[in-house]
């Protein structure tokens, strides 16, 4: 039985991970839980899964959590604040830590888990996007496994099983196209928050659903794929695949192409990350290609999706620039969800912030450099949102 700590337990990734654990009680057990601010849901999870330790990032809500489970016996260790989440991530009894926290907030807990010798089921792409220059050397130093738990990188990882070293030629990341794949570019000026949250295929959290609508999610995945699989950016391509049945593909040196297929269900990559290298039987609905029907592909529209180009440019710049891109995107999407800026302001603001960082880009950033760049970018967004009157030039991927 594998012992698991789940960081980000009340979010979309967290609840689906717990669904898997509840289906396979003879395979997995929860020893640690950490969440952001949802006291009620975390208390319910503690009651059901009986972890040894739990934390809530919103420290002011710790007394409410303590009160909500005061009748439990035995009592888990309860902690509050970011430091509490980090303690949960490094807790001794866990073999694998699932990182399901959204955004750069997952970086420090992931590093703590790696330094404690835990294998990582990585569902938090920002850990590598912002912290790749720091995280990958730590993974090697501590001899832990870094297993992708999002659908696209899990698909690539699965396709690579049995491929000899040097056999990989190209990665093709598939994208649904998000909520606006069938909209004309001219209509994007009318986008509301409700429009952006209508993903055609996947059920996800609010932030990642907006990222899917801008295709920044796919741009961030390009950077993550670069760190995970070691390919140059010119060898990582994005293709629009509206059905979300093929989760990604790899091209080998002899031009053979391998793909991983399945219904759009995050539980499958999560289960594989938890069970690897084993394959566990499930009673989930198998893929029926006749039922799925046509599988279609098209090139992404760079005019409609400028965030894609910004991500490629940041990835190629390297250093601390991906951390700035990621932080700016997180902050701008939060402003959009609060209806403080328009949808089309998202790429404009991100580009302004990245442009301002060019002269300060740190080529070989330390963890402190990355955290400083992250904080700088978030503050810079507030300035950039005041300077959106003129349409900027979009950075080219070429």
From Swiss-Prot:
Quote the InterPro entries the UniProt record gives.
DXP_reductoisomerase (IPR003821), DXP_reductoisomerase_C (IPR013644), DXP_reductoisomerase_N (IPR013512), DXPR_C (IPR026877), DXPR_C_sf (IPR036169), NAD(P)-bd_dom_sf (IPR036291)
Stated name of the protein: 1-deoxy-D-xylulose 5-phosphate reductoisomerase
Q: Which gene encodes it?
A: dxr
> What family classification does the UniProt entry report for this protein?
Belongs to the DXR family.
Give the residue spans that cross the bilayer. none
Positions bound to NADPH: 10-13, 36, 38, 124, 126, 205
Please tell me where 1-deoxy-D-xylulose 5-phosphate binds in this chain. Answer: 125, 151-152, 176, 199, 212, 217-218, 221
Query: Which Cys-Cys disulphide bridges does the record give?
Result: none
Q: Organism, per UniProt? A: Trichormus variabilis (strain ATCC 29413 / PCC 7937) (Anabaena variabilis)
One molecular function GO term is: NADPH binding
Q: Taxonomically, which superkingdom?
A: Bacteria
Alphabetical UniProt keywords? Isoprene biosynthesis, Manganese, Metal-binding, NADP, Oxidoreductase
Give the matching NCBIfam families.
Dxr, PRK12464.1
The chemistry this enzyme catalyses reads:
2-C-methyl-D-erythritol 4-phosphate + NADP(+) = 1-deoxy-D-xylulose 5-phosphate + NADPH + H(+)
Taxonomy of the source species? Bacteria, Bacillati, Cyanobacteriota, Cyanophyceae, Nostocales
**Pathway noted in the entry:** Isoprenoid biosynthesis; isopentenyl diphosphate biosynthesis via DXP pathway; isopentenyl diphosphate from 1-deoxy-D-xylulose 5-phosphate: step 1/6
